[in-house]
């Protein structure tokens, strides 16, 4: 428990203090946001706002995790390192994308094939490594069995698992990327989901099969390799994003950029895969799914019928064009995300209670 508290507090402190320093550095170098001409007119004032702010919470999360381990004297686990690797790797792809947008003033950044290649390399490396490093109970960080609130009984094999893991990583990283269109929206939503995974990791640790002899209901235990370590990473991410939100909320002093959005999406996917809650992530991260589906519906409808369902996609811009203020959209979408987290945690607990 002390690890979780230290990780969250350190992550919060580092981004609260470190983000304004990053803002000054990025502003001095002229690394400002490039605004597309086809977006809402109210976004014109955002042009030039420092971007690549994801650097702040990526570094803060890594430092917070490591310091929490040093302070408490606890061992560093493979599961935590794998999530940090996935987060940093996806963040690096996003950083290259942001850098090209800024330096070359090209709104689309990396070429689609190059961006996809980078995400695939990082994702495949994570998927392969997550099936290594068995512990004394022969648990590896990930499992080849699909999961909702825990693993299902059948395995899909390592090859299909890698394909599935890649799908999750790409879907979540791009889902957060699509959500990051309004000040504080993606950051605030991510704080809620990381908070949920902090709780899930702690609960799984207390009900771990490694402690089955001490449990009142051993049949409901969790076969997760390092649940407490995942909770520490999630707490570090929650704290770091919460501190970043101070500077990212409207009117934003800095944007996370693709550096941040791809990193957060990767971290969410990694936590879901390693905590055996893969399908549950679709509910816990319901806002990201909803916004992603709005783009799929918009593109599909236009290609098939020549008509658009929404005034603009992603969904948050549709409501802006209907006359909602940016802050109103963000707060209402946060409420939706909060309800998704409540439902997701309720289902997680129900899955455990049903086995009592």
From Swiss-Prot:
User: EC class of this enzyme?
Assistant: transferase
Q: What is its main location?
A: membrane
| Entry GO MF terms | metal ion binding; phospho-N-acetylmuramoyl-pentapeptide-transferase activity; UDP-N-acetylmuramoyl-L-alanyl-D-glutamyl-meso-2,6-diaminopimelyl-D-alanyl-D-alanine:undecaprenyl-phosphate transferase activity
Which reaction does this chain catalyze?
A: UDP-N-acetyl-alpha-D-muramoyl-L-alanyl-gamma-D-glutamyl-meso-2,6-diaminopimeloyl-D-alanyl-D-alanine + di-trans,octa-cis-undecaprenyl phosphate = di-trans,octa-cis-undecaprenyl diphospho-N-acetyl-alpha-D-muramoyl-L-alanyl-D-glutamyl-meso-2,6-diaminopimeloyl-D-alanyl-D-alanine + UMP
Any idea where this protein resides? Cell membrane
Single biological process term from Gene Ontology: regulation of cell shape
Q: Hey, which pathway is this one from? A: Cell wall biogenesis; peptidoglycan biosynthesis
Q: What is its EC number?
A: 2.7.8.13
- Which UniProt keywords are listed? Cell cycle, Cell division, Cell membrane, Cell shape, Cell wall biogenesis/degradation, Magnesium, Membrane, Metal-binding, Peptidoglycan synthesis, Transferase, Transmembrane, Transmembrane helix
Q: Name one Pfam family in it.
A: Glycos_transf_4
Classification via PANTHER family: PHOSPHO-N-ACETYLMURAMOYL-PENTAPEPTIDE-TRANSFERASE, PHOSPHO-N-ACETYLMURAMOYL-PENTAPEPTIDE-TRANSFERASE HOMOLOG
Q: Which NCBIfam families match?
A: mraY (TIGR00445)
Family membership noted in the UniProt record = Belongs to the glycosyltransferase 4 family. MraY subfamily.
- Record-given protein name: Phospho-N-acetylmuramoyl-pentapeptide-transferase
